[in-house]
């Protein structure tokens, strides 16, 4: 972790070489202590954090709605900037610049380190993904969500997408 990496290997070796063996055995890493200190939150902070997470999910829900997305018209950048403006209107800040991208059957929307998506316009049948977080009082959210843009005459996502989501969630549950 970047917060607990202050002692370089050279310095560590120098300290260890200058200490008698009986003291060398007492040297332990403080990394977990530093991480636990940063992770420690008061009950008020946890209440605020839960509210912050709820706000984050509500912003994503609205961003992925027909209020913001018009298939064939709205771009991924339109959604990104709508999210940023929404956060600003609430007096909050984004923790990092949001990412919105699309995935299409038979096509990939993988992008390079420049973050530039190959697809701009969100169409019916697209799977829209976002990575989005807000910050408040040193508390940060980091949420990723998916949404399916219904095709004409569809009332719900196709069965294959529901099954894929279920499998993904099952793996996620197994790993947490």
Residue map of PLM features:
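Active-site neighborhoods and metal-handling regions in enzymes and metal-associated proteins
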Residues: 1-176
């Amino acid at each position: 972790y970047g917060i607990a990496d202050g002692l370089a290997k050279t310095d560590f070796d120098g300290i260890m070489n200058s200490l008698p063996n009986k003291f060398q055995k007492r040297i332990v890493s403080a990394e977990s202590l530093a991480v636990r200190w940063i992770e420690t939150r008061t009950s008020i902070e946890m209440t605020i954090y839960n509210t912050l997470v709820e706000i984050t999910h509500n912003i994503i829900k609205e961003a992925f709605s027909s209020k913001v997305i018009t298939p064939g018209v709205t771009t991924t950048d339109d959604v990104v900037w709508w999210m940023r403006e929404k956060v600003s209107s609430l007096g909050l800040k984004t923790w990092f610049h949001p990412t919105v991208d699309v995935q299409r059957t038979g096509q990939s929307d993988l992008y390079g380190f420049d973050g530039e998506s190959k697809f701009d316009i969100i169409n019916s049948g697209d799977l829209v993904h976002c990575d989005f977080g807000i910050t408040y009082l040193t508390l940060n959210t980091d949420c990723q969500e998916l949404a399916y843009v219904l095709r004409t005459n569809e009332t719900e996502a196709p069965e294959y997408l529901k099954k894929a989501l279920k499998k993904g969630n099952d793996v996620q549950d197994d790993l947490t």
